[in-house]
């Protein structure tokens, strides 16, 4: 009887091996596919599917059940290659000159495409890798700066793109035709998810069909301002306009030389920026008329845009820079803790108005906050005179 049972078991095993050999081999010879799942960590992680999935969508269904609700700030689609610092840096510099790859040079179509590690540049004229390498330092260094600041902005290309996109126009007429605001040296289009820059803003000019470097262009502040908007593309719809513009103004105000940002002298750079916007020199200090904090906090996008052709624009940009600088370097323990907490709260879905109440004002009324701000700036040689315009006031 035992012998008969053993023979029966052997027969069953042989039948299984005959019927299912391919299925076993196929699972053994391939890696399990992966499904992207969002977690509270903004870096997209890959969850391997179990190889014995019996239904085509079972792994996807499992990941959907395990994944938390989507964040308000869309997490990057790919892991960031540079992590934010814990403390504010005094200097941020590229390790070397960016490597440039020629993607295509179509003379008939008038389309020339070049790439550096984090950007793709489409041009309407053949610039060549040496010229691209010259201005790419500003792009790549601004990416590095926004990655490293303790704000942890996690810059990432727009959805469905692996690289940030830049459109370089060879002349000012082509730049204007692309929709450039009058007098602009560059702009970021949220609709196209692309930065538009005239070659003249990059220290490049075309002479008789030849591309030449223009040594008279010494400042990259407008370009860096607009690149910073691109670095914050995921945040733009969710943050108050004073903060998105203030962050871009801060980056543009920093001393930038040959791929290197110097942040250790930002107080001096701030005063220089304010003087450029009309501040009066008072001995070793500067005096500037800043929009009252309550009105600044209440400014929305349409109101900001409506003031772009008026004297309010100058005051708006300078006031946004001053408030952002204060939150980065002077508020409370001077460690940007309130700003960082505000960003993390918005990242998790809290409306920015409430995040400002909870982490920026942090129990202070706008007038009290303003008083503290004035004292802190006076300590570094910036005298603020807060002015009213009669606009809406933020409700604490």
Q: Could you say what each language-model-derived stretch is?
A:
Residues 1-113, 367-396:
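N-terminal low-structure segments adjacent to metalloprotease catalytic domains
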Residues 187-204, 218, 238-396:
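Acidic/His/Gly-enriched intrinsically disordered linker/tail segments
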């Amino acid at each position: 009887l035992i012998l008969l049972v053993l023979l029966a078991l052997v027969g069953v095993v042989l039948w299984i091996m005959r019927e299912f050999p391919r299925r076993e081999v196929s699972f053994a010879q391939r890696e399990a596919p992966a499904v992207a799942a969002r977690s509270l960590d903004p870096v997209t992680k890959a969850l391997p599917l179990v190889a014995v999935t019996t239904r085509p969508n079972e792994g996807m269904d499992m990941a959907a059940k395990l994944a938390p609700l989507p964040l308000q700030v869309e997490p990057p689609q790919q892991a960031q290659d540079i992590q934010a610092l814990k403390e504010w840096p005094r200097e941020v510099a590229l390790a070397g000159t960016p490597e440039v790859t020629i993607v295509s040079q179509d003379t008939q179509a008038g389309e020339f495409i070049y790439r550096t590690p984090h950007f793709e540049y489409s041009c309407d004229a053949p610039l060549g890798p040496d010229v691209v390498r010259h201005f790419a330092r500003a792009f790549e260094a601004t990416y590095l700066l926004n990655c490293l600041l303790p704000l942890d902005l996690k810059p990432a290309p727009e959805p469905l793109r692996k690289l940030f996109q830049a459109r370089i126009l060879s002349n000012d007429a082509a730049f204007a035709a692309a929709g450039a605001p009058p007098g602009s040296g560059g702009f970021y289009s949220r609709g196209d998810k692309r930065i538009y820059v005239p070659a003249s803003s990059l220290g490049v000019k075309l002479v008789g069909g030849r591309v030449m470097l223009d040594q008279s262009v010494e400042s990259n502040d407008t370009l860096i301002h607009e690149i910073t908007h691109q670095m914050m593309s995921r945040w733009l719809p969710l943050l108050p306009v004073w903060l998105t513009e203030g962050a871009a103004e801060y980056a543009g105000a920093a001393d930038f030389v040959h791929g290197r940002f110097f942040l250790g002298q930002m107080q001096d750079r701030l005063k220089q920026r304010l003087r450029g916007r009309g501040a009066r020199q008072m001995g070793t200090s500067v005096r500037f008329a800043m929009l009252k904090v309550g009105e600044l906090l209440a400014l929305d996008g349409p109101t900001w845009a409506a003031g772009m052709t008026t004297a309010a624009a100058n005051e708006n940009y300078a006031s946004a820079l001053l408030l952002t600088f204060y939150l980065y370097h002077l508020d409370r323990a001077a460690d940007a803790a309130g700003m960082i907490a505000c960003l993390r709260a918005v990242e998790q879905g809290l409306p920015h108005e409430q995040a400002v109440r909870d982490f920026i004002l942090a129990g202070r009324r706008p007038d009290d906050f303003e008083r503290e701000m004035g004292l802190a700036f006076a300590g570094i040689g910036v005298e603020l005179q807060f002015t009213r315009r009669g606009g809406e006031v933020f409700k604490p």
